[in-house]
Amino acid sequence: MSDEKKKKRGFFRYSVLTTSSFSSWRRSSTSGSISQSSRTTSKTTTSSSVTSSNPINAPPPTATSSSSVLPSTSSEPPPPASAPPRISIYHKMVPSKSKFRQCDVCEHIFIFDFVRKQHLDDVYACNVCGIRVHKGCLDRVKNDCKITTQYMGGILENAVIQSNKKQWEKPTTASISKSLTTSPTCSTSTTMSPAGVEKNVHKTRKLISMTTSTLDDVTTFNSEINEEMDEETVLMTWEDVTIKLTDVDVMTKIGDGRFGSVYFGGYHGNAAVRFVNMNYLSQEDRRADVFATEIVSAYKNSRHDHIALFYGYVSDPVTNTYAIVTNFYQHNTLYHRIHEQLSEDFDQSWTFQISLQICQAMSYLHKKKILHRDLRTKNILLDNPNRVVVTDFALMKLERLENPRRNCTLLIPNHWIDYLSPEIAGNLMIDWRGDVLFQHELPFSQESDVYSFGTIFFELLLRRMPTGCDSWDQKLYAKMCGQKAALQRLDAQLQKIDGKLHELLLECWSSQPEKRPSFQQIVKRITVQMPRKESNKQKRRSTAHENPLF
């Protein structure tokens, strides 16, 4: 077969060399061989090729340019510079029935032999490379079976991994340049593998192909990896979010909550300082660690447009001061706007917009494996009349509700039972033997947050609470009786809601947690049902028949 024919069919032939000690991989661009060479010139190399079709006994000279040629002692002339590299392995020939191919040795087409009524068993094919020859041409076939791209990729990948395994533990510019360059003196960029190998092997990282590179290419390699890194995985360190108590200017008190007090303060501008009560832990030495791991870590790893912007935290075990510093939002809570500003009329588009923003924030928190545990309209702040931010997440804990200790009582706010899912309400049981609550944590989950959003969605649609002014024990009893019994009194009010919204609300309020949709699914459904604003052109068209000027 001619050289052009071999090049066209893409035959690969490689000569693998081993050395007594190796530290880098080097390939001569003209001889088409890959060898392991030591940086010391005193050691000799030994040939370990599978066959002796193209032995190389002399060590390769130092490559000063891309045109250096390795000497060969074989009688076979060295391949031209344009010849593709090969590796010497045996063919695995089996009978073939292919008639629409030609012999790769004599280049005769098999169909002509079939017309001359020769036996089909006279055609043989290799299981590895797919070469097809006549039976009479088997003796003329050389042991140069074409390797597959997967096989070649495995050889090169293992070679690079073995030679750079220790260096990759602490990647540096020098270590990357050693693994990607052929020799210290090489100044040009050459390819160690065929185009097919570079295309099919390592598709996810294009620059981790078996190509040589200069120091400039190494800089590009590092920059592209940094661009591919997920920005959400680059989290702030604890030192970046630690704030000294003296650096925060605490001013006026905004309000009190179940878990602490909120103050208006200053920290490089307006800020909200939320002091968290950690007195429920009797062991004072554990308060700082629990505060950092359970509360601060959730805020530190969260960045979203509809989540309260986190500045840092204050932890001072000496003075028993633990606080979270966030951005200050001058508007009131969503509860205040829905239930206290009764004179304001809300259109349906505003309801959809606020609901969508809440679900987007909660979908982000659930993606980060963070549970809110206390999703209510009082924990949703208004940045402006049409934008909300979610706050006070990861603060809910049964031990905080039990503090200070009372006889068979629990300190809960108004309408808190309305946001509890049935599986959470079922755990609010009292141990009458010890006159205290059971010492186990409430089973909060992503589904319980979805149930809480269902109550918020009901408030946005009807501007009232689902259970009205009932006492907490009546609400808890109705919750334990099942969802259908609790919704019987709401049938008349739910008739005012659109059918699709009614269906979404009931799915969020399902008594079976596995049947509740995720926040990601709710975002898609609200986006589809959200009314679109009518453009000015459409308004003119709709009123054209009423205006005689049109």
Curated annotation (Swiss-Prot):
Belongs to the protein kinase superfamily. TKL Ser/Thr protein kinase family. GO terms for cellular component: cytoplasm. Residues 21-87, 172-196, 530-550 are annotated as: Disordered. Interacts with ndk-1. Residues 21-56, 63-75, 177-193 have a biased composition (Low complexity). It comes from Caenorhabditis elegans. Residues 248-528 form the Protein kinase domain. The keyword Zinc applies. Probable inactive protein kinase which positively regulates Ras-mediated signaling probably acting at the level of let-60/ras or/and lin-45/raf. In the germline, regulates meiotic progression during oogenesis and mpk-1 (isoform b) phosphorylation. Plays a role in meiotic recombination events. Functions redundantly with ksr-1 in the Ras-mediated regulation of larval survival, the development of excretory canal, in determining vulval precursor cell fate during vulval induction and in mpk-1 phosphorylation in somatic cells. Disruption phenotype: RNAi-mediated knockdown causes sterility characterized by a lack of oocytes. In a ksr-1 n2526 mutant background, causes larval lethality. The protein kinase domain is predicted to be catalytically inactive. It comes from the Eukaryota. Keywords: Meiosis, Metal-binding, Zinc, Zinc-finger. One of its GO terms (molecular function) is zinc ion binding. A zinc finger (Phorbol-ester/DAG-type) spans 90-145. This is Kinase suppressor of Ras B. It holds the Pfam family PK_Tyr_Ser-Thr. GO terms for biological process: meiotic cell cycle; nematode larval development; nematode male tail tip morphogenesis; positive regulation of vulval development; Ras protein signal transduction; vulval development. The keyword Lipid metabolism does not apply.
